[in-house]
Each structure stands twice: as C-alpha cells, then as structure tokens.
C-alpha cells in the first residue's frame, strides 16, 4: 500500500498513474489549494481515478492537520510514502512566505513524525534543484549543496532534507530525496515558464 501526498499536482498525479502495476492500493492526499487552478487539479484526479479505478482513493487533507493524517495511517497501514506535497513556486514565496513555512516545513514535519510513529518502511520525498543556490560548478551532484539557499522556497526544501536526515539517523527511517529540476509535460503547472 502506497500513500502519495500532493496527488493532484502535476508530478503527484503522474506518479499515481505510474504506480498502477506496482501497488494494489494507492491512497492520494492533497489540499487542492488555490495557488493555481483547482479545476486543473480535479481534472488530474479524474484522470488518475479513470486509470486506476478501485486501486485509487483520494482524500482532501492538509499535512498540517496531524490528527487527520494519523487517522489515515491508522486505517491504511502503508508500506511506502511518496511525499510530493508542497507549496510550489519560487516567485510566489516572495508574496506569501508564511504559506511556505506552514506547508513545506510544518506539514513535512508532521508527515515525518507520523511515518516514524507508524514505522513506515520507505519514504521518498521531493526536494528541489533550487537547494543548489548560486552554485556554478557543473555538473551538479547531491554532494555539492553549500546550504546557502537564495530563496525561501529553497530554504524550506533544504530544511526538509535536514529534517529527513535527522529522522533517518535518529529513528532508522529510510528516506530518499529527489531534487527535481524543471519538470514539464502534458498536465503541467500553468505557472511554469513553458506554459506562459
């Protein structure tokens, strides 16, 4: 059984669809926030549901609601958690920094804590290429992070990596972070450069 957070987002919906042959049960959660078109998010969910049928269950939940999160874990007994939930968008973080701290840091902390409590075997979480900051040595690799993010969004993602590392060390959780660069394709986010 797999939990996918941020399942109505571009990467989240595609991830759910790609899990069709791997898992018999996929639970997806998302806040359906209004950062960009909720209609687009619902269309993605409809596409996921059409592809996966009864294998997929959607729940509208915010990671900041730890009580609801715990109930989902109690009910579902997950083997793997794929965390793709986040307040996205580098530019938007300048206008609404509080949303980034609440969702990307506090929400991720709640998810980690619940994963620890329920002894989740594997956690895969989205990070971002923005954690590299102004790094000029190419090609980039995971060992080149200088901990000098130049935007708040990047700082929240770097914070997630640090919390994940601490939880991995303290509680023997297996956590992998994926530092996505610009991800694009059909059903992509309308605020991305390619769609403007």
Show where each model-derived region lies.
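N-terminal Rossmann-like NAD(P)+-binding domain of SDR-like oxidoreductases, especially those catalyzing
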Residues: 1-183
